[in-house]
Amino acid sequence: MLEQASNLHLFADVLARVHAICAALAKDGNWPEGIDVSRVVVEPPRDPSHGDMATNAAMVLAKEAKAKPRDLAEAIAERLRADELVAKVDVAGPGFINLTLHPVVWARQLGTILRDGDAYGRIAPVVGAPKVNVEYVSANPTGPMHVGHCRGAVFGDALCSLLQFAGRDVTREYYINDAGAQVDVLARSAFLRYREALGEEIGAIPEGLYPGDYLKPVGQALAAEHGDRLKAMPEAQWLPIVRDKAIAMMMAEIKDDLAALNIRHDVFFSERSLIAGSTNKVAETIEFLRERGDVYEGRLPPPKGAPVEDWEDREQLLFRATAYGDDVDRPLIKSDGSYTYFASDIANHRHKFERGFADLIDVFGADHGGYIKRMQAAVKAVTAAQAVLDVKVVQLVKLLRNGEPVKMSKRSGDFVTLREVVDEVGRDAVRFMMLYRKNDAVLDFDLAKVIEQSRDNPVFYVQYGHARGHSIFRNARDSFPSLPVEEGARLAFLRQAKLEKLADPSEIDLLKRLALYPRTVESAALAHEPHRVAFYLYDLASEFHALWTRGRDLPYLRFIIDDDAELTMARLAMVQGVVSVLASGLAILGVNAPDAMR
């Protein structure tokens, strides 16, 4: 039985060893004190034929060490060759170092998976790390969620789970845009449906109001609650009544839609509360900026090229955004005296900082790409650069069926709803496929393809990998009935396996893939890119399925060898490693890991 030599994941373990070698060389060679090793990395080489790992240590430290990169690489390589983990070290090119590890190291890493189960790769809470606030979805409460909202919702939810797995304290937030002109349009649209519910013939929906049938229940609820008394009121009197009812019903529907996708939020924060609360936080924030010289009365120059949003040729109150990296200063108050959306957003992010968040992440739709610089400038200003805002832009989703665009629904009027998609293909397919492409790339989502049972359908292929693993366990009990059914007991049982029996190159390759998981999670969390986990899971499932297929053709590679209990237990331990990692990664993505599939 093998034990993992370190609680670090394997790449971090080797990096620590490289750091120790550099520290020893620095002491022996009188390098400058405090030499910066933060840029030293240990990662898989681009070409697997170059070895198992590569480090840039010599390339990034040579200047400070006052040495030639190649000479420094040879010195580091000489000490690495004495390391118990390392079978071979090569210096390539101007000073890159490639390492090949002993095969037993990969089996030892499997021992760590058997110890940790689906917690393998989880990072302990980071002491002293700033609290993270992730704002995502934040769809206007003016209608049901559409398939475009779906991608941002899944991305934000998976990112939160990823960050929590990586040891961060995360709050999931939804910002309710309930204070702008669009909710007044919602109220007027709902009032039309209210009149319809009272028996009026309303005809075609006027341009500028929200079409579709989804506001009919709001109109019916208003009629049931108020009868016809709202009709006699002037707009200024009925509008807030209708608006509040419509917002409440739309938010209830949005929350139901999110629940269908298992999207969770800890906080639903109202934009209106910034203005209508006991303190007008927007006015307070503007005054805060004024005291620091970050707002002024001025006139913006005419836009060059593409129109600048909110530009008006008049003297107005401006935020000095250019002082914080933006391209142009930004208006805070409209000509009618109301606040710009940007002013409310500044107050919202200042409020987050006051609540103790210094690591802020906003998930924006593709149409908000031009909003990034101004928001990052605002966060710098209102937090004195003590908070950092990362904005992740989620690109459009093209909804297809067998390659053809999907028609819009009557209920929504001009879009396909999230609920329609989830009802047709299921939550797991939606969640996985929304993450199976980098967030800033347009996504083609084909309703027919995502339910195919083939390797061309990534969600099926990954889930089938987990189910296949459990199928192997069930079959193994026919010959080895002592193999436990319960997960924890099975992990403990398989920890006794002789993992050094895993020696075939295809088995070692699979073990190497398993060893990559903690590094994948760590790098995905640092980059705020959950798609990396989805890509990794597909690659892992592919290698697992390929090994199973080879065993069907080559009996000596089968997972279950009836007359060789030791080899079978080692291979079942490897299968358990695959099952545990697939379950862990799918949990981060919010996708079910089935034990069986039809």
Swiss-Prot record:
Gene3D superfamilies: Arginyl tRNA synthetase N-terminal domain (3.30.1360.70), HUPs (3.40.50.620), Isoleucyl-tRNA Synthetase, Domain 1 (1.10.730.10). It is found in: Cytoplasm. Keywords: Aminoacyl-tRNA synthetase, ATP-binding, Cytoplasm, Ligase, Nucleotide-binding, Protein biosynthesis. A motif ('HIGH' region) lies at residues 139-149. Its EC number is 6.1.1.19. GO terms for cellular component: cytoplasm. One of its GO terms (molecular function) is ATP binding. One of its GO terms (biological process) is arginyl-tRNA aminoacylation. It holds the Pfam family tRNA-synt_1d. It is an enzyme of class 6 (ligase). Its main location: cytoplasm. Coiled coil: none annotated. SMART domains: Arg_tRNA_synt_N, DALR_1. It catalyses: tRNA(Arg) + L-arginine + ATP = L-arginyl-tRNA(Arg) + AMP + diphosphate. InterPro entries: aa-tRNA-synth_I_CS, Arg-tRNA-ligase, Arg-tRNA-synth_N, Arg-tRNA-synth_N_sf, ArgRS_core, DALR_anticod-bd, Rossmann-like_a/b/a_fold, tRNAsynth_Ia_anticodon-bd. NCBIfam families: argS (TIGR00456). Belongs to the class-I aminoacyl-tRNA synthetase family. Monomer. This is Arginine--tRNA ligase. It comes from Bradyrhizobium sp. (strain BTAi1 / ATCC BAA-1182). The gene is argS.
